Design a protein with these regions (language model features):
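Single conserved hydrophobic/aromatic residue that forms the stacking wall/gate
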Residues: 1-14
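Short, surface-exposed "cap/lid" segments of acyl-processing enzymes
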Residues: 45-85
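Alpha/beta-hydrolase active-site loop
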Residues: 77, 110-132
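Primarily recognizes the serine-hydrolase "nucleophile elbow" in alpha/beta-hydrolase
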Residues: 127-181
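Short beta-strand/loop motif that positions the catalytic acidic residue
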Residues: 239, 245-247
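N-terminal cap/lid segment of alpha/beta-hydrolase-fold proteins
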Residues: 16-46, 50
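Accessory cap/linker subdomain of secreted extracellular hydrolases
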Residues: 164-234
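Catalytic active-site module of serine/aspartate enzymes centered on a nucleophile-bearing elbow/loop
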Residues: 277-281, 286-317
């Protein structure tokens, strides 16, 4: 997909916030396969709470940007989120996932990577922040796929004061994959379901059609098996900390229904649909793909202000 800037004016609103620069400190987490690198964003405040920001799927870096195989998408969503929270007296830690950008040295061979590796990394950061006397409390925020990672890292973890699901899926990954391919011919849909059924049962599939090799290549199947074990509805129900579920109503990647499924699974959770916010946390008044794509490639467009206000109220309640 080539991202166009046509129509970007539809996504710029005066309600967005201009923030001053925050102080940043580089930090790293040692793992058996190498260092994972991140940045702490510090507000001008004494002993602030800190929020661990966990990015979504794919080659997404700590700032919320993608740069892989000749495809670049810079929107600075997580960096802008960190800056906005710093203005409100809240510290953040965002990091490059193992194998991505500055954490590329911590990569595992694809066939050795498991979903639990990302969970363990998040738990490592939580431990690190919990031991840092500069911060009053540790909160976890997971965006998109990072929501499930953050949930799992927070279950039975007394070091986590509260959890925030931001545009997190409410269904298992295999359901989402099958939905995304629902427009394909019936034969393809049948093959995908058959492969997924095997992977859900913990069985790798050897005969993958060439057209599905990118999605189900043999080296990624162990990771998919590990990912498919988790249903976000079941995981979020195990959380004992305060939980905030946030979803934008102009998100074309994750639906409001996903957020509602999470809320149904944990009725006591706080829940808010944010008006005119899309998947990269920007103000956008349209679900038209050309307009949406403009925000995905605009690093100067601020994040939605109500998002910052809602997170601040939750963290400082």
């Amino acid at each position: 997909i080539r991202l166009s800037l046509v129509g970007s004016e539809m996504c710029i609103r005066d309600r967005s916030v201009t923030v001053r620069a925050m102080e940043e400190q580089s930090v790293s987490l040692d793992t058996p396969t190498g260092k994972i690198n991140g940045k702490i964003g510090l507000p001008d405040a004494e002993k602030p709470p800190i929020v661990l920001l966990i990015a979504g799927s794919g080659p997404t870096d700590m700032d919320g940007n993608t740069n892989s195989s000749g495809f670049s998408m810079k929107n600075n969503s997580l960096k802008l989120l960190a800056e906005g929270l710093a203005q409100r007296g809240i510290a953040t830690l965002r990091f490059d996932k193992r194998g991505i950008a500055s954490s590329s040295a911590a990569a595992k061979k694809e066939s050795d990577l498991r979903f639990e590796d990302y969970v363990a990394d998040a738990q490592g950061w939580i431990d690190r922040l919990s031991d840092d006397s500069r911060f009053s409390d540790v909160f976890v925020l997971g965006h998109s796929e990072g929501s499930l990672i953050g949930m799992l890292a927070s279950v039975d973890n007394p070091k986590v004061k509260g959890f925030i699901s931001l545009a997190g899926a409410g269904r298992p990954a295999y359901d989402i994959i099958e939905e995304q391919l629902s427009g394909q011919p019936a034969e393809i849909q049948y093959l995908v379901k058959s492969i997924n059924d095997s992977l859900k049962a913990g069985k790798e599939v050897s005969n993958i059609p060439m057209g599905l090799m990118t999605l189900f290549r043999p080296s990624v199947q162990p990771y998919l098996i590990s990912w498919y074990r988790y249903n976000p509805q079941e995981v979020i129900a195990k959380l004992r900390q305060p939980v905030l579920i946030l979803q934008g109503d102009k998100d074309v990647q994750v639906s409001e229904e996903d957020a509602k499924l999470l809320k149904q699974s944990l009725p006591k959770a706080q829940f808010q649909i944010l008006k005119d916010m899309n998947h990269v946390l920007k103000m956008c008044e349209s679900v038209d793909m050309q307009v949406q794509q403009a925000t995905y490639a605009n690093p100067d467009l601020p994040v939605q202000e109500d998002l910052l206000i809602t997170i601040e109220k939750f963290v400082k309640r």
